From Swiss-Prot:
Organism listed in the record: Francisella novicida
Stated name of the protein: ATP-dependent lipid A-core flippase
PANTHER family tied to this protein: ATP-BINDING CASSETTE SUB-FAMILY B, ATP-DEPENDENT LIPID A-CORE FLIPPASE
Residue ranges occupied by any ABC transmembrane type-1 domain in the UniProt entry: 38-319
Family membership: Belongs to the ABC transporter superfamily. Lipid exporter (TC 3.A.1.106) family.
Domain ABC transporter: 351-585
Signal peptide extent: none
Length: 593
């Protein structure tokens, strides 16, 4: 496929995506077509106005003065009617552009909720947000501005060419000075534009923030089933942005008609002045002849701008096509695979990993991993960085799919379960705690479909050793904790994350311990909170603390994507193998209790 064919195919697909909005656009184009044809006619009408509005020899007679005054009144009425049509046309055309933005941003955001982990691994947050925001704006140019420019300026050019050919060089053009009127009007409009722009930019920042937060925390959103909640939050911010942009469009659409009405009033005033004070029954004023020249000159001057606009259309389309390619890349990206149809109403928490293998491309990460985890057990996975521990937990959650082997949950292959059902039985407490720019209450009740009482949240906070510090916050559990819990300390953020998992009360917990040490007091209360969390569920821990491995029911030592040792702490120490070396090398003895 040639580049020209590719551009044509993409542009055609783009227009098909918004075909349901084309009626909206067609109405705007129709109104533009009518009133731009009238524009060309108005320029030509300078000829009869000046020729028949003056007496023999070009002077002003009583009869021609009456004609001029009638023409002045008629012109104001015509321009006013035309301006109303122009406003309607510009509003519909501008609204079409914003409807395209609104549609594509919704479609892309909804698609992001369904994309697999591999997509987020390949693309940075900035790239994704840029496609969601900036690229969509570029597409707007192709679906509104480019189409309208061809219709609008193409029609105008044709009309002006006709005028130029049928006119003659016999009149000069009145120059209308409207500076003071326009200056005052533009000053008022500019102030309103600045205020609307500030509101729009501020609301767009909220849209960007929510989108970035969603992308950064996509695992938590899915594990806790909060897709709809986050989607509603995003749409609320987007709705406000949309309303501000529509107000801006309306103001922009109003500006040009008002200026034209002011100009027509000045022109009418000039005609009245000539009719009243310029009457000369003896032959008139010869300098007011040559109407055909005036209409030709006006057409010649007016044709420059639409021709310039038409030359810019190709640039607009090329930019839009490049943006469209990126947008369709996201919309066409394969969704997270839903391989299962079974649903388990209740799970005990038995997890069996059989001969599991996985690779990222050519890089083998896991090879023949087998582990049996009984319900209620705490199993600690240890090993140096890159040994496959985190990848294993991601496969359990089905963010990745194994190439070989199987993972069983209570004897059922996890690939046979629906994603929503599987993840409803899992909780995650990440090494890097992910919290949302929301209240303590909403962070802990995050993603739960049922109504959660304040008492339930408080109970979870107490069990997580977090209620004491939450009580001291300005609004208690209804205090906003900032972006990713920025208003809290590291230990406090961890305890909020633990309280969230406690409230969900899933039978299987995946816990990736933080590698950085807390102060002794924070470490103590976090450990107590973890004990409360793990006592009622199966716990899979990526361990970084000596106290964790000492208390685990089983320790699995991984190296190079394989299980090399397995057993209890003391048993492995007595073997004197890789685990003993990792204890001496990797674990800080100050964590031991």
């Amino acid at each position: 496929m040639t580049n020209h064919q590719k551009v044509g195919t993409l542009y055609k697909r783009l227009l098909l995506q918004v075909k349901h909005l084309m009626a909206f656009s067609a109405f705007g184009c129709y109104r533009k077509y009518i009133f731009l044809s009238a524009d060309a006619s108005m320029i030509y009408l300078i000829n009869p106005i000046l020729n028949y509005g003056f007496g023999p020899g070009g002077g002003i007679t009583k009869q021609s003065a009456t004609i001029l005054m009638l023409m002045g009144v008629g012109m104001v009425g015509f321009i006013a009617l035309r301006s109303v049509g122009s406003f309607v046309s510009q509003y519909f055309i501008g609204s079409l552009g914003q409807k395209v933005v609104y549609k594509f941003r919704k479609d892309i955001y909804k698609r992001l909720m369904d994309l697999p982990a591999s997509f987020f691994d390949k693309h940075s947050t900035g790239q994704i947000i840029s496609r969601l925001l900036y690229n969509v704006d570029q597409v707007t140019e192709a679906t509104s501005t480019a189409i309208i420019t061809v219709v609008q300026d193409g029609t105008f050019v044709i009309g002006l060419i006709v005028v130029m050919f049928v006119s003659s060089w016999q009149l000069s053009l009145f120059l209308i000075v409207v500076g003071p009127f326009l200056g005052l009007f533009i000053s008022i409009i500019n102030k309103k534009f600045r205020n609307l722009s500030r509101n729009t930019q501020s609301s767009m920042g909220n849209v960007t923030h929510t989108a970035e937060e969603t992308i950064r925390n996509y695992k938590e959103i899915r594990i806790f089933g909060a897709q709809q909640k986050q989607q509603n939050k995003f749409f609320k911010n987007l709705d406000y942005t949309y309303s501000q942009q529509i107000r801006t469009i309306a103001l922009d659409a109003l500006t040009s008609p008002v200026i034209q009405i002011i100009a027509s009033l000045v022109l009418a005033f000039s005609l009245f002045t000539i009719a009243i004070f310029g009457t000369n029954d003896g032959g008139g004023s010869s300098w007011l002849t040559a109407g055909s020249f005036a209409s030709f000159f006006a057409a010649a001057a007016a044709i420059l701008k639409p021709i310039k606009n038409l030359t810019k259309v190709n640039v607009v389309i090329q930019k839009a096509v490049a943006a469209t390619e990126d947008i369709f890349y996201i919309l066409d990206y394969p969704a997270e695979k839903e391989t299962g149809s079974k649903e388990l109403a209740k799970v005990d928490g038995n997890v069996t990993i059989k001969d599991l293998s996985f690779a990222f491309g050519e890089h083998k990460v896991l090879s023949g991993v087998s582990v049996d985890i009984k319900a209620g057990q705490t199993v600690a996975f240890v090993g140096k960085s890159g040994s496959g521990k985190t990848t294993l937990t991601s496969i359990i959650s089905r963010f990745y799919t194994q190439h070989k082997g199987e993972i069983l949950l209570d004897g059922v292959d996890t690939r046979e379960l629906t994603l929503e059902n599987l993840r409803s039985h899992l909780s995650i407490v990440s090494q890097n705690v992910h919290l949302f720019d929301d209240t303590v209450y909403n962070n802990i009740a995050f993603g739960l479909s049922r109504e959660v009482s304040e008492d339930e949240v408080i109970d979870a906070l107490k069990r997580a050793n977090a209620y004491e510090f939450v009580q001291e916050l300005s609004d208690g559990i209804h205090t906003n904790i900032g972006n990713n819990g920025s208003k809290l300390s590291g230990g406090q953020r961890q305890r909020i994350s633990i309280a969230r998992a406690l409230l969900k009360n899933a039978p299987v917990l995946i816990f990736d311990e933080a590698t950085s040490a807390l102060d002794n007091e924070s470490e103590r209360v976090v450990q107590q909170a973890l004990e409360s969390l793990t006592e009622s569920c199966t716990t899979i821990v990526i361990a970084h603390r000596l106290s964790t491995v000492e208390n685990a029911d089983k320790i699995v030592v991984m190296d190079g994507g394989k299980v090399v040792e397995s057993g209890k702490h003391q048993e492995l120490l007595e073997q004197g193998g890789l685990y003993t070396g990792s204890i001496n090398r990797d674990f800080n003895s100050t964590y031991a209790r």
